[in-house]
C-alpha cells in the first residue's frame, strides 16, 4: 500500500508539472519542424519541450493525426502545419496516452474528428477533466483494448496497446506502407523518460517488438525525429538500468543506496528533467518500486 501511495503521489506531482508546462507554453510561437517521412505521412517535431510531437497522415478523403500538443496554442501550431499540406478535414485523432501534453490540442486540431485511445487512456482523461477542467481536455469517442486498424484510403494505420510500459494504457501507431511508427512517450530521443504507473520490464519487451518491425522513421514523443539506431539506444538504456537496479534490489540494497550506485556514464548525453521526475535517479527509483510490487 505504501509503495502504491508513493507511486500515485509521483504521478500527481508529474501531472502538476505538466500543468506548469501548459502555462509556460502559452504564447510560445517558435517554428516546429515538419518532415515528410513516407508517402503522405509527416512528422511534426515540436519546438516546445513541454508539448508533444505529432504525426499526421493524409488520405484521399481526410487526415489522421497522432497527438495534438499540450493546449490550444500548440494545437493551433499543429493545425497550421497540416493546412500547409492539405485542406482535407481531420477525421481521426489518436492519443497515445492520457498526459495533457499529448492531447491538450484535440479540440483545435480535430473539432469534428473521432478521437481514439485505449480504454485506460479514456478513463484517466475523464478523471483529469474532473480534477483539472482548465486543461479543456477531450476524451476519446472510440476506445480499444488491444488493437484497432484505421483505413484511411489508400493507407492503413495500425494502432495497438503493447502492454504496460510508459503508462498502463499506451498506444503505438504503425504505418506499414510508410515503414514508420509514432510512439508517444514509449520513446524519447536522448532523454530519460518520465515513468508513470507502467512497467519498465515490459517496456523493454515492447521496444524489442517495435525494433522487429520494418522501420525507416520513428517519431518519438518528444525531441528529434529518429531511426532504429536511436530507438535501440533508448531501449538499451532502459534495459541496462533495469538490470542494474534489479541486481541491487536482489542484493537487498536499499533504494536510496541503489539510486546512488547506478552507472549511466555512457548515457551522459541524455536530457534530464528533474521537474518531471525524468532523471536517471528518478528512473532507478521507479524501477526499484516496480520490483517491490512483483
Model-derived segments and their meaning:
Residues 3-18:
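Bacterial N-terminal signal peptides that target proteins for export
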Residues 60-64, 73-116:
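Active-site metal-binding motif and surrounding structural segment of the metallo-beta-lactamase
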